[in-house]
Curated annotation (Swiss-Prot):
GO CC annotations, alphabetized: nucleus
Pfam families from the UniProt entry: Spy1 (PF11357)
Assembly description: Interacts with CDK1. Does not interact with CDK2 in vivo.
Signal sequence, renumbered to the chain: none
Region (Speedy/Ringo box): 134-265
Keywords noted in UniProt: Cell cycle, Nucleus
Biased composition annotated in UniProt, kind: Polar residues: 43-52
Protein source organism: Mus musculus (Mouse)
Gene: Spdye4a
Tissue expression remark: Testis-specific.
Family stated for the protein in its record: Belongs to the Speedy/Ringo family.
GO MF assignments: protein kinase binding
Matches recorded under InterPro entries: Speedy
Protein name: Speedy protein E4A
Length: 268
């Protein structure tokens, strides 16, 4: 490992973790609840608004030639202009359009490819459909420019915990966590990287370097880190295994990204 003073420049990451322990795992559902509530209110206002041309009988109206009392003038309800209702609908939908589009994207459909042809018989093989979308690559690339993340990757010169396959798994985990793009922070990068080392590395000692970089020799913040890691795994539905094929597909999306050069086989 390289030399440096770990735990100093990571104060912002610790402060973010202490300020919001949920780290967006619940914020997405709360936001959706607000959006649905606003939609229900607008729907109720339409149902309760009177329709044009509908009148209700009032006391004193003559029915079958008999009068039930003093007649009162009929007043027709004046409905709201349709243009104002449509405008209010458009205004309410503008704030939630992007989030809903990202949340309710249809699941990828299975893809079949021909594996073998033998005479008139054909054998099909089901191809795996990746759940990684362009916004997940964009979030990952943006986090690579964070000063703490950039310093960590420079610090791990021997690629003990951050080679190209482990970093590919970070993107895969981002695609499964179910968070909105704007909710990802540097702490999510370290949570995903720690989990990737948990899954792939036989030697579990190097992943302790992540703690050493973030918190130094202090053990006070480690229980909180593990709590956030558990929340992160649960948000993925416990789907934490990533195949080598998926890692290579993730790297092929943007092969010129500089982190894909972090190959242990090239170390001398």
């Amino acid at each position: 490992m390289g030399e440096g003073t770990p735990g100093v420049d990571s104060a912002r990451v610790q402060e973010e973790g202490g300020r919001d322990q949920s780290l967006g795992f619940v914020e997405g559902r709360i936001q959706v609840g607000r959006i649905v509530t606003a939609g229900q209110l607008s729907l109720c206002s339409e149902e309760q608004s009177p329709q044009p041309g509908i009148t209700r009988p009032s006391p004193g109206v003559v029915v079958d030639g008999e009068s039930s009392g003093l007649a009162e003038p009929r007043v027709e309800a004046t409905p709201q202009p349709p243009s104002s209702i449509q405008k209010r609908k458009r205004d309410e939908s503008l704030d939630s359009e992007d989030d809903l589009a990202e949340l309710f994207e249809p699941d990828p459909q299975p893809v079949w490819s021909v594996e073998m042809l033998c005479g008139l018989r054909m054998r099909l093989k089901r191809r795996r459909v990746s759940t990684v979308r362009p916004e997940h690559h964009k979030v990952f690339t943006k986090l690579l420019e964070d000063p703490v993340v950039k310093k960590f990757l420079t610090w791990d010169k021997m690629l003990r915990v951050s080679d190209k396959y482990l970093l590919s798994m970070v993107i895969a985990y981002f695609s499964r966590a179910g968070l909105f793009s704007w909710q990802y922070r540097p702490i999510h990068f370290f949570l995903a990287l720690y989990l990737a080392n948990d899954m792939e590395e036989d030697n579990q000692a190097p992943k302790q370097d992540i703690f050493y970089f973030l918190y130094g020799k202090s053990y006070a913040q480690r229980p909180m880190f593990h709590k956030l890691r558990f929340q992160f795994i649960r948000s993925m539905g416990w789907k934490i295994w990533v195949s080598r094929e998926e890692c290579e597909e993730i790297q092929a999306y943007n092969p010129d990204l500089w982190v894909w050069a972090r190959d242990r086989t090239n170390l001398t």
